């Protein structure tokens, strides 16, 4: 996938996220609760929590909302117990999907995810049926401007342990292992760089190009899944046309 096409897909997703800001805060709040519950409420000693806090800040989540979620996870405030569940399957046109969820009711979530796939031309599969097509990677996106020195950003990222660095007219994309994500992000933040997005994600090894004629049908499935409060992330290997507006 070309850098420009990657950015187009990221940009389209970001536009949708901006329109659903309250829902995004709810989803990130659940991630904060889980991270705090599993590793404690101190980000200095909990790298997973540090990473989720960075994701929250990249999405302009208010600090008091972040703090409340962390306290719920640590048991300092009353909260709900969530379980992590992952679903895999195929959407229309053979597109592979990995759907990560945090739920307080596994039966409800499984039913909703299965119904979304069935209604929009897909099939929910067994665990592992498509997961092998993706790799867990840290991904940071920095919006490019004329004052930025590409070589400087690249050297900071690579020296800190980044695996890959790509640039386009609009953005710089930095890829890391999940283990080195936090360190690379912190080094870039220390140099004053701000992120459009910064998170550990699932990146497909190969992508399927989707025509304009088929894009709308696939987008309906993605939107249906992302609209579910229990769904945290929807990963797929579709590459939408550059002119697709979602």
From Swiss-Prot:
Please name the GO terms of the biological process aspect recorded for this protein, alphabetically: regulation of DNA-templated transcription
For whether the record's keyword set contains Transcription, the answer is: yes
Residues of the signal peptide: none
Q: What is its main location?
A: cytoplasm
Please report which protein family the annotation says this sequence is part of: Belongs to the TACO1 family.
Q: Which GO terms describe its cellular component?
A: cytosol
Protein known as: Probable transcriptional regulatory protein CTC_02215
**Alphabetized UniProt keyword annotations:** Cytoplasm, DNA-binding, Transcription, Transcription regulation
Q: Which domain of life is it from?
A: Bacteria
Its source organism is Clostridium tetani (strain Massachusetts / E88)
Q: What is the lineage of its organism?
A: Bacteria, Bacillati, Bacillota, Clostridia, Eubacteriales
